[in-house]
Design a protein with these regions (language model features):
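Short, small-residue-biased leader/transition segments that mark boundaries at the very start
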Residues: 2-4
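Internal nucleotide-binding/catalytic subdomain
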Residues: 10-151
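Short, conserved charged micro-motifs
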Residues: 19-22, 197-200, 250-257
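Short beta-strand/turn micro-motifs at beta-sheet edges
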Residues: 75-77, 176-178, 228-235
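Generic C-terminus detector
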Residues: 227-232, 236-289
């Protein structure tokens, strides 16, 4: 088995050579994902829970943020095409202290040291997309930026001052800077246009929001992605992933129920969302008890 990836818009899982050939044709010739398919990468197929770890670094030390779990497939039960992400939860229950220590020793610090050795020191936010395989943690992807929609559940849990952390990354004092996260949880549910990630319509009026947010909702933030405002002031859809509804709570169950309750108050024509964000994480938590 193998994976065929374009420039971030989609991934095809291929079980044999014929599926791989068909996949390359769909991406590169049929332009299934548009211009993102001008180049593809063929990768080994790995299995295991996925973990997203955003981290701060000043080029010398790495301070990971709270872990998160993305939900890439478009539909429930992890079916359908891969997307940019249909929802996230934090923290990720599969990312135990033991796994975190192994990642720091074998992945995070070696990455920073290697970049320094190549004369390309990095300062800022470094995103590690990991898979916890039977052979240990493996790197699926790096990003030199915050992740979307991971950031929507990570930063709401940050208790330290973000500006001070960013400043310490630039001036090389991150080792002395506190990076503290709350003990709570966060969940984000993406509201997408029907047909995403392939063909979808734009310009659908969005209802339920006041000044872009849900009124009278505590611990809920609506993040805008594919939205626009018409000349007459109407908020409309303008992309595949339209809105992200994030809720925080003392436990994951609280955050998830609140996020879904809030999402129900928003509507637009052909709205699509997954109904099972976080269920895998809840099962993992239940197994630990």
């Amino acid at each position: 088995e193998m994976c065929i990836r374009d420039r971030g818009k989609g991934v095809l899982i291929c079980e044999n050579e014929q599926q791989a050939a068909d996949g390359v044709k769909e991406i590169m010739l049929d332009k299934k994902f548009g211009a993102s398919g001008n180049h593809v990468v063929v990768e080994e197929f790995l299995t295991g829970p996925e973990v997203s770890v955003l981290s701060f670094t000043d080029g010398k030390v790495v301070k990971p943020m709270v872990s998160s779990m993305d939900h890439k497939r478009a539909n429930d039960h992890d079916t359908g095409l891969n997307t940019g992400g249909m929802g996230t939860i934090a923290p990720n229950p599969y990312y135990t202290p033991e796994v975190a220590a192994e990642c720091m020793e074998k992945i995070f610090l070696p990455t920073i040291h290697a970049m320094n050795a190549e004369g390309c020191p990095f300062k800022g936010c470094l995103y590690f997309g990991l898979m916890l395989t039977p052979d240990g943690p493996k790197v699926i992807e790096y990003n030199c930026r915050f992740g979307d929609p991971e950031t929507q559940v990570v930063l709401p849990l940050l208790e330290s001052d973000l500006l001070h952390i960013m400043q310490s990354c630039t001036d090389g004092t991150l080792a002395q800077q506190e990076v503290k996260f709350s003990d709570g949880a966060a969940a984000c549910v993406i509201l997408a246009s029907g047909g995403y990630p392939v063909a979808y319509e734009k310009g659908k009026p969005i209802s339920g929001l006041v000044d872009g947010q849900l009124p009278d909702e505590e611990n809920v933030t609506v993040y805008h992605s594919g939205t626009a405002i018409t000349e007459d002031g109407q908020l409309v859809t303008n992309g595949g992933r339209v809105l992200g509804v994030t809720a925080t709570g003392p436990r994951l169950t609280n955050a998830l129920s609140h996020a879904y309750e809030a999402a129900e108050k928003i509507s637009f024509e052909k709205l699509h969302k997954r109904s099972d964000i976080g269920l895998r994480a809840l099962k993992a938590l239940a197994e630990k008890q």
